[in-house]
Amino acid sequence: MSALKRMMRVSNRSLIAFIFFFSLSTSCLYFIYVAPGIANTYLFMVQARGIMLRENVKTIGHMIRLYTNKNTTLNGTDYPEGNNTSDYLVQTTTYLPQNFTYLPHLPCPEKLPYMRGFLSVNVSEISFDEVHQLFSKDSEIGPGGHWRPKDCKPRWKVAVLIPFRNRHEHLPIFFLHLIPMLQKQRLEFAFYVIEQTGTQPFNRAMLFNVGFKEAMKDRAWDCVIFHDVDHLPENDRNYYGCGEMPRHFAAKLDKYMYILPYKEFFGGVSGLTVEQFRKINGFPNAFWGWGGEDDDLWNRVHYAGYNVTRPEGDLGKYISIPHHHRGEVQFLGRYKLLRYSKERQYIDGLNNLLYTPKILVDRLYTNISVNLMPELAPIEDY
């Protein structure tokens, strides 16, 4: 009888433990599904701690070797003890002097004296009326936020595309920060906010494709920046022009502890020339909900023969504006789509997109509202 009671106690404990762990695991899965942004932030924070610990151990070992050796060799050159041969130093770049004279018929330099480096980022909420009032004093800003330097020829004509839904408090902060920085960089630019209406899950990639098509109808741009509304650069030397290869600008984000989450990470802020974006057939349209579209874009870029470049050192640092919105639901089908990125590249993108936009031109941006649905991007079997 006593043995039976002991067995029942053990069974009850096992049942309680099973219920506890089952409840915990299902709660975690539900949290990851309904709040992927928060869940991934926590995950990246844990990963970043491990990376930082390994880097610190590596640095300490490097310093011990320098101290214990009388001479150390770097790239075949002997350096006496005490010289700094750190792998982490970044060579400083020379920027033009304050008295540099621009010529209206010559291209604007990429390294201007106004570009001082570190930017003070203010993420305090501000109304659109206040921001409009501030920029109303600048008569050179045209409708849609269009601006062009007059003292030199802009090296790039940049369309900044911003996918949008229910982040109205972020937009004025974004413009207050970005407009002065792009003016310092002597780029021609304008902003396009592509707003998703309706009840379908958020489709960031499809919004970018819509924005690209509408921006090309508006002006003859040659560089396109794909920019999340809650990402603010911390360094004005992070030049928003394009290049021979696609560019990932937001290499170090504060919510990821300024560490690149993984090598193929291509999210937040990226830039491609118009030619590059057309060659890869744009973003995929099939990613509904959170996650996967940036990884697919990375694949498209590499399948087209390009490499991705990033800013050196701390130039690619960004601050993420805090928000109180519920995150978009996870797109659980993204892994299957990513397995077939190559097969889908030229049947899902700019070439299969249908939409009917509503366009409103504001003083600082062009608003493109569109109700997205899966049938607006029909895809053939692959």
Curated annotation (Swiss-Prot):
Catalytic reactions of this protein: a beta-D-glucosyl-(1<->1')-N-acylsphing-4-enine + UDP-alpha-D-galactose = a beta-D-Gal-(1->4)-beta-D-Glc-(1<->1)-Cer(d18:1(4E)) + UDP + H(+)
Glycosylation sites noted in the Swiss-Prot or TrEMBL record: N71, N75, N83, N84, N99, N122, N307, N367
TM annotation in the entry: 16-35
GO molecular function, one term: metal ion binding
EC main group: transferase
Gene Ontology biological process terms from the UniProt entry: carbohydrate metabolic process; central nervous system myelination; central nervous system neuron axonogenesis; ganglioside biosynthetic process via lactosylceramide; lactosylceramide biosynthetic process; neuron maturation; protein glycosylation; sphingolipid biosynthetic process
Tissue expression from the record: Brain and kidney.
Alphabetical keyword list: Calcium, Disulfide bond, Glycoprotein, Glycosyltransferase, Golgi apparatus, Lipid biosynthesis, Lipid metabolism, Magnesium, Manganese, Membrane, Metal-binding, Signal-anchor, Sphingolipid metabolism, Transferase, Transmembrane, Transmembrane helix
Record note on disruption phenotype: Single knockout mice are born normally and grow to adulthood without apparent abnormalities. Decreased glucosylceramide beta-1,4-galactosyltransferase activity seen in the brain of female mice whereas minimal or no reduction in the enzyme activity seen in the male brain. Double knockout mice of B4GALT5 and B4GALT6 genes develop normally during embryogenesis and perinatal stage. However, they show growth retardation and motor deficits with hindlimb dysfunction at 2 weeks of age, and they all die by 4 weeks of age.
Ranges per topology, Cytoplasmic: 1-15
Bilayer disposition of the protein: Single-pass type II membrane protein
Residues reported in the UniProt entry to bind UDP-alpha-D-galactose: P163, F164, R165, N166, R167, F202, N203, R204, V229, D230, Y258, W290, H323, H324
Binding, N-acetyl-D-glucosamine: G292, E293, D294, D295, R334
Cofactor annotation: Mn(2+); Mg(2+); Ca(2+)
GO cellular component: Golgi cisterna membrane
Control of this protein's activity: Inhibited by EDTA.
InterPro entries registered for this protein in UniProt: Galactosyl_T, Galactosyl_T_C, Galactosyl_T_N, Nucleotide-diphossugar_trans
Full protein name: Beta-1,4-galactosyltransferase 6
Organism: Mus musculus
